[in-house]
C-alpha cells in the first residue's frame, strides 16, 4: 500500500459516513475528495512545505465534528470553491462541506458593526473540524469581519475562507487564532478583489502546536491590499505563514508586514510571495518580515520572494532576524525596572505596531491584554 493510500484510507471511512446532502453539494464533495486522494498530504519534500512536517496530522485518526454555521444555500454555489487554491488541505475541507458561514453584503451597503464568527473547538478532543466561510461583498460596500478560532484538547482544524469583493468595495478581515496548545490548525484565506477595492487582512497567531496559515489575494486594476501578521510561538510550537499577493492588473498597490516572536524551542516559517503579472504595470508593492528571537533554540526560516514579469513597477522586500536590544534593556534596568519586566516591555513594543493597525477598538484592547499576559511569562 502506498503512503498516500495509507493516509487517505482513514479519511475515506470518515467521508463515507457523512449524511447525504443536496446533489450539487455532494458533487462538490466527491470531486474534492477525489482530488485529495490523488494529492495526499504534503511532505517536506514539497518546496512549499519543506520546513513544516504535517505527519502528526496525516498519521492520526480523527473523527469528524460538526462546525457552526448554517446549511449551505443555493446562492453560495456561484462562488463556493471557486477561489481557494486546489491543494490537499483545501480539497479536504471541501470534501467535508456540511455547514457554512455565508455572508453577503449588498452593493453600496456600509456595515458599521463588525461581523463576528467564532469557531469554538472546546470539547473536540480527537476530532477534525472543517470550518468554511464565504464572504461576498458587493460593489462599493464596506464591511469588517472577525474570525476567531479557539478550543481545548488535541484536535485538528482545517479552515477555508473565501472572500469575493466587487469594484470599489472596502473589506477589513481579522483572523484571531488562539487554539489549544495541543491543537493542529491549517487555515486558508483567499481573496479575489475587484477594481479599486481596498482590502486588509490581519492575521494573529498565538496558539496551536502546529499551525499553517496560507493567505492570498488576487488584485485587479487600482486595487489596494494590505497584509498584516503577528505570530508568537514558544515552547515547541511551530507556526508557518505563507502569503501570496498576485498583481494581475495595472496600478495595484500592496503593503505587507509580518512580525514574529519566538522563544523556547519554537519554530516558525515565513514565505511571502509577490507576483507581478506582465500586464500589471505601475504596480507598487512592499513586503517586510521582522522576527524577534528570544532564545538560542528557537528557529525561524524566512523567504521573501518577488516574481516580476512587468518592467514599470516599484517593488521591495526584506527580512530581519534579531534579538532584544541590549542598550534598551540596560536603559530600562538602570531606571529600576526589573529584568523580566524590561524584557516583557520590549517584546510587547516589537509587536505593538501590528496591534495598533487593528481598527476595531474592543478587539485591539482584548489583544493588548492577551499579549501583556503572555509576555509576562517570558523567561528572563
What function would you assign to each model-found segment?
Residues 31, 79-337, 351-380:
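Conserved beta-strand/loop scaffold segments within soluble protein domains that form the structured core
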Residues 1-101, 106, 115-117, 257, ...:
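N-terminal amphipathic, basic helical "cap/leader" segment at the start of enzyme domains
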